[in-house]
Amino acid sequence: MRVSDSATEMTQIVLPQHANVHGSVLGGTVMHWIDLAAAVVANRHSRRPVVTAAFDELSFLVPIQIGQLALLHARITLVDRSSMEIRVDVESEDLLTGEKRHTSTAYVTFVALDPVTHRPVAVPPLELETEAERQEHAAAIERRRRRLEHRKTQLWGASPKSRI
């Protein structure tokens, strides 16, 4: 399956109920929107139920204000046996001026599940068509290597007493 086959875009207007006391969208709300957009991509690619396994490298660069749009662009970057990494870029758009600003990028890992057993299942391979997709895929392999190394040292590394 090609990257473009599952890519999605989502638009959300920032309303007062999405905002903090400073009038900008709550970080947790943006994370929720990122998770939703990424889940659509993972579902489209795998055609299976999916669950969120990890969020990586999420930073909030500039705030999105009440009345602005949050534009989310999501695409798959890596497929492993049962897991998929999805990149989500978030922009703000000022509806009065048309100005767009990059506000954040997140990498979200999903696992595809069998609908009956709820166990991880294989997903279709990823067809890379462009040089940009190949470069993003190479970077995704490195992120995956770092995630696995981190998980190994954090969960199965030294005992908790030895870290004190």
PLM segments and residue spans:
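Hydrophobic beta-strand-centered segment that forms part of the acyl-chain substrate-binding groove
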Residues: 2-5, 25, 39-73, 77-84, ...
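A conserved, well-ordered hydrophobic junction motif at loop->secondary-structure transitions
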Residues: 18-33, 163-164
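HotDog/MaoC-like acyl-thioester-processing domains
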Residues: 8, 65-69, 77-164
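Generic structural detector for well-ordered beta-strands
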Residues: 11-14, 59, 109
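Hydrophobic pocket-lining residues within nucleotide cofactor-binding pockets
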Residues: 19, 55, 113
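Buried hydrophobic packing segments
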Residues: 30, 34, 38-42
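Short amphipathic
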Residues: 3-16
